[in-house]
Amino acid sequence: MGDMPFWKTKSLDEMTNAEWESLCDGCGLCCLNKLEDWDTGEIAWTSIRCTLLDGENCRCKDYDNRQATVPDCVQLTPKAVREISWLPPTCGYRLVAEGRDLYWWHPLVSGDPETVHAAGISVRGRTVAEDGIEIEDYEDYLVTWPLEVGLEPVE
């Protein structure tokens, strides 16, 4: 058991900060704007990314201070991961919370932060910045691919 990776031996609550942060695969999916139907609670995804998400490297441009710039940025915690229904099905936090293993393309498994992009999981090249887009126009950017990434094997 000593040679098993930490995500197979620890719960989210038991992880160090460094282990916790490394569970993020860098896909950027959680930083896409989502719309919620007030009647049904259904979540609809858009291709509109947060103003702080870099569309190419799929990382936050100001991670440490993100909530000062984007007050509604969701801070992932073990409790939040267990409660948030919209985390992508491939999310490392979600997978570990559900007792499942990380995918082959996750940087912790592959050893390479580029595999999440090469496997077609990330938002790289598929988004537009939210800056200048009116909220009433968000429906023009509805997409389903965030819930479909990772379902088909990459050729």
From Swiss-Prot:
Disulfide bonds: none annotated. It holds the Pfam family CxxCxxCC. Signal peptide: none annotated. InterPro entries: Puta_zinc/iron-chelating_dom (IPR005358), UCP006173 (IPR008228). Belongs to the UPF0260 family. HAMAP family: UPF0260 (MF_00676). This is UPF0260 protein NGR_c07710. It comes from Sinorhizobium fredii (strain NBRC 101917 / NGR234). The lineage of its organism: Bacteria, Pseudomonadati, Pseudomonadota, Alphaproteobacteria, Hyphomicrobiales.
